[in-house]
Regions:
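C-terminal functional module detector
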Residues: 1-157
Length: 157
């Protein structure tokens, strides 16, 4: 198998000026600088993961041994061209489904921290409305990911 992945386009700061739209200060208040404004540069892919899923051959076969998430992990060297990996499955003996998951370098994302709970269990969700201080940008680092379509491979009879 060969898998290739390229990261998302790095976004330029702020929003493009609009004609006929809201004034720049209003747009900034609404969007907080989160407009789609791609540059030519891409975010780095740090690793590619392969997920392997095999169907049960009999009803009492344990499922936990059939789902490997991840089954294989390939680190990706920094590259503007993205990442390319090759692999095979030397253990292939039955019908199998594979997924490829590409992981970008961690970057700040709105609500990336989920409920933002501390060790005592007290949570501080980012609702995105009056319940959250306007100065709280709700940013937290996340590793954005993309999935391939499933790859179904049948064992020849």
């Amino acid at each position: 198998f060969v898998a290739r992945a390229a990261g998302a386009f790095v976004q330029l700061p702020g929003c493009e000026p609009m004609s006929g739209g809201p004034p720049a200060d209003r747009l900034e208040a609404l969007c907080r600088g989160e407009c789609y404004r791609p540059s030519a540069k891409r975010k780095p892919i740090v690793r590619i993961e392969v997920i392997r899923i095999q169907p049960q051959n009999k009803p009492d076969e344990p499922i936990a041994t059939l789902v490997k998430d991840p089954w294989r992990t390939f680190p990706c060297p920094p590259s503007d061209a993205g990442c390319k990996v090759e692999f095979d499955d030397p253990e292939f003996t039955r019908d199998t489904t594979y997924y490829i998951r590409a992981i970008e370098e961690a970057s700040p994302a709105v609500n990336g921290g989920g409920l933002r709970c501390d060790k005592s269990g007290k949570c501080k969700p980012c609702y995105g409305d009056y319940r959250v201080d306007f100065k709280d940008d709700c940013l937290a680092p996340v590793e954005e990911r993309a999935w391939s379509s499933p790859i179904f491979v049948r064992k020849a009879p």
